[in-house]
Amino acid sequence: MKTKLVRYPEDLAQHIESQDIARALHTLFLETLMDAERRVYAEENHDLSNGYRPRRVRYEGHILQLRTVRTRNKGFYPKLLHILRGGGGTVPKLEAVCYLPASEIGGIQRYVSMVYKELYSRKQIARLSATLQNLMEHWRGRSLSPHYERVILETLSLPLPHRAASAGWKLVAVLGQDVWSYGELLGVYGVREGVEGDALGFVENLRARGVRAVGAVASDGQRAMEEAVLRHFPRTI
């Protein structure tokens, strides 16, 4: 059977908002960035992790509860938290570039440097950038479940670099739900209006990571991605 397209007329935006896709994604990214900081710190100080402490921050219109790494000697404190308390600076743009094709941004080190400025040395910025990129690539490439009852697509409002924005790129977060309505962030994909290859690349990525069937798909207007799911995934395995 083919995947069915689920339409949510008036309540589509509310339905997607209720999944807290953006909130979950922002939390994941900020915790990953702090983890990258902690790894660079550990390389220099050999101070191992010792659990987490909760921290509440405001970011992109959300109040997020973050897990902040503690270290045994209590010498580590993520500089990201200072930046967020000061308004966040260019952190949202760094988050955006982590999901765009490298050809559109020229690598993430420039944006890591824009975020941390003089808080880290050039050498530390280089290590932090490489660590963050490796962590994000691991997350983007992890294996997925073979079947999702529903896939939900939501356009993100993160600020894009001028070059990417001028080229028409937008970022779409993808949530997969199982039969118990448990949600899992599958990834974030850069797509352009009218470029069929971007939507096809999204589907090929899901297939390469193990997805074999999707029961239903809904979005806030991402027709090309919806149609790609309809064409390439059966409803059941």
Task: State each model region's role.
Residues 8-9, 29, 45, 50-53, ...:
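Electropositive nucleic-acid engagement tracts
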Residues 65-72, 79-85, 90, 118-119, ...:
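RNase H-like nuclease fold core
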